[in-house]
Amino acid sequence: TYVDALPRMVSKFDHRIHTDYRQAVAATGRLSSNNPNLQNIPIRTEKGRQIRSAFVPRSSEYLFMSADYSQIELRIAASFAKDETMIEAFRNKRDIHATTAAKVFKVALEKVTPDMRRKAKEVNFGILYGSTAFGLSQNLGISRTEAAEIIESYFTEFSAIKRYMDDSINFAREKEYVETILGRRRYLRDINSRNITTRGFAERNAINAPIQGSAADIIKIAMILIHKWLEREKLKTKMTMQVHDELVFDLHKDEQDIVKPKVMELMKSAVILEVPMEVEVGVGKNWLEAH
């Protein structure tokens, strides 16, 4: 998919690879990449890591810099739901998955085991995507009964999240659309369908689309702010890629001390939420090293 295809897509004019970004493909509003798609190059497999290491900056005067929003969707969910437990955890820079595990399994934070944290992480993300007890049991390799108990405990401890989910579905039923943080709408005509499968799909979108869509809004605002700043300051550093919650730059070596903190500042302040944004920044000789 990549090893054979990517070398053939190198431009004969500047000897670089150029992708196309489209705004109107993904229903959530996230940018999609094609020709070639640079947003789905794996990083967890050894081959994927080798492929990422093949991406290098434009010349020896540059490094790669990766700036990645940390847990942006969970932060947006906590902000939308006004869940005090989650908000407090994010404000105090606590491990959100360990915090969730402590609440769900009713143990002290320091007593949370790696297995508890793993299950809590799956619940944190799964709930936002409408995960059921069956889905959770499959993903975690546990019984459906145990999965149902975990979800019930989660909703008891994080009642504001449950309220947000119910309110989102009710809003969508009335309006037949949901909105992102900046007011961009996703229409859900099937939310009142008599077909339970069709309706269920729309209900899951009613919960998740405002969150995913708001994440898309926020990173686009950040991209505009960063681009304008780079142009205004006449810097040599260039923004080269957007991979969902990550921005990748050709960072000029002489500009590291200026660009790194400013990019973090602009990304964190793109849209102000109830919880602070966190941005993880890495620098390296190639994309793998920078991530």
Protein language model regions, located:
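Conserved catalytic core of nucleotide polymerization and phosphodiester-bond processing enzymes
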Residues: 1-291
